[in-house]
Amino acid sequence: MKTLLIFLAFLSSIFASLIGLTPPSKDSFYSPPVGFATAKPGDILKIRNTPSAPSSLYLPIVVKNAWQLLIRSEDSFGNPNAFVATLIQPLNANPSKLVSYQSWEDASHIDCSPSYGMQFKSPATTVTTQIDMTLIVPLLQNGYYVIIPDYEGPKSTFTVGRQSGKATLNSIRAALQTGAFSGIKKTAKVALWGYSGGSLATGWAISLQSKYAPELKENLIGAAVGGFATNITAVAEAVDGTVFSGFIPLALNGLANEYPDFKKRLYGEVKLSARSTMEKGSQNCLAASLVGYPMSQYFTGQNRAFEKGWGLLQDEVFNKTIEDNLLLKLDKTYLPQVPVLIYHGTIDEIIPIKDANAQYQIWCDRGIQSLEFAEDLSAGHLAETFTGAPAALSWIDARFSGKPAVNGCQRTIRSSNVLYPGISITIRIYFEGISKTIFGVNLGSGVNADKSISNKFFAYIRKYI
């Protein structure tokens, strides 16, 4: 199976170079029309069928329809912008059920956008989006329409909360307007789901919703967030100098793309010897950055990229920019008004569980109506992507079925989230196969297996990069 996938990916890359998809940076569809600023947030500016079929692990997905929508939105400061979202209609579509899926793009260049990377014939640079698409397939199999926003927006503002949250909400607004061609009812129920970088966008969306998109209250039925990113500083502390250090230049450039003063300070502080690496962080997609810059030190060690080390975070510009994008720092008026599931691996080596714990406690103390925390003792960040996905899907299915969510706050610690109640055998077998394909291990196979998953993941994506 692995050999077949690698061969198909190789063929798709060659095919793309000959016939290929036009990248967003060169595709006029991604540019808004003159006068677009007069449209309301959530209005659809352009519509087209996806240039190529959606695909997962470089294999085309059979669906009834797939469209790209250019949607009016706003940046963090309320300035008008426009972004693309992909709306997929499955063969057995239920017009009253829609899932907003926030992909873990985790990059700061528009050519890494999910709308591009999720298509058949997309380049190998977007291999992580092809992996992420494996989580969308079972949603489609269940008959749910799925909207996947390029929530980072036209500037690719990775880790910027308000931009991401607003775009997510505006993609839902837009999807609910498409009934004339998609069949989606304006009264459709909507669930949100995001893991890792996608959890950041999802978390901000449900936190902003009551103020920014109050009319969606009747549509939204819940949100599942996994590998929950609530504190980007803690992520930097966790990955600096590790095999995952490639996240840091991506995140810093994502912030720089939204905040000009931050960008000026960032490139003024980085050592000349590290400037090239930092600049490539604004050009590389996730896989290339992880493979290209493992073990790099930005804030620690004698050869760190920033002479001031962690002291740089005390700089006024750095501190304000980062504080503005910490979900943990939002006040009580941003309390989510929908049921929430948090699922997280205890030994998450990228997004420490302590900050998901902190967010859980904050929301509970503020009286959230329904919040469930499913902690997985045996999973790190990569493993929980697939160990936790069946739990998230089961939880979403329960919301669509009208089953009551937990009342108040409930925390459960399991040896593996594969043991989450209600997971169907079919879904478990599906994710078991994905886990074996990418990691070579069974779902929930224990801490010892998890320790080797990072190496297997890197080996997998190196075959594409």
Curated annotation (Swiss-Prot):
Location of the active site: 196, 348, 381
Glycosylation-annotated residues: 231, 319
Listed name of the protein: Lipase 10
Induction and repression of expression: Expression is not induced in medium containing Tween 40 as the sole source of carbon.
Family (UniProt): Belongs to the AB hydrolase superfamily. Lipase family. Class Lip subfamily.
Localization of this protein: Secreted
GO annotations of cellular component type: extracellular region
Enzyme type, top EC level: hydrolase
Keywords attached to this entry: Disulfide bond, Glycoprotein, Hydrolase, Lipid degradation, Lipid metabolism, Secreted, Signal, Virulence
Parts of the chain that traverse the membrane: none
Known EC number: 3.1.1.3
GO biological process, one term: lipid catabolic process
Cystine bridges: 112-285, 364-409
Primary location recorded for the protein, binned into one broad class: secreted
Catalytic reaction(s) noted: a triacylglycerol + H2O = a diacylglycerol + a fatty acid + H(+)
Function: Secreted lipase that is able to hydrolyze both the neutral triacylglycerols and the monopalmitate ester Tween 40, allowing the use of hydrolyzed products as carbon sources. Has broad lipolytic activity, which may be important for colonization and subsequent infection, therefore contributing to the persistence and virulence in human tissue.
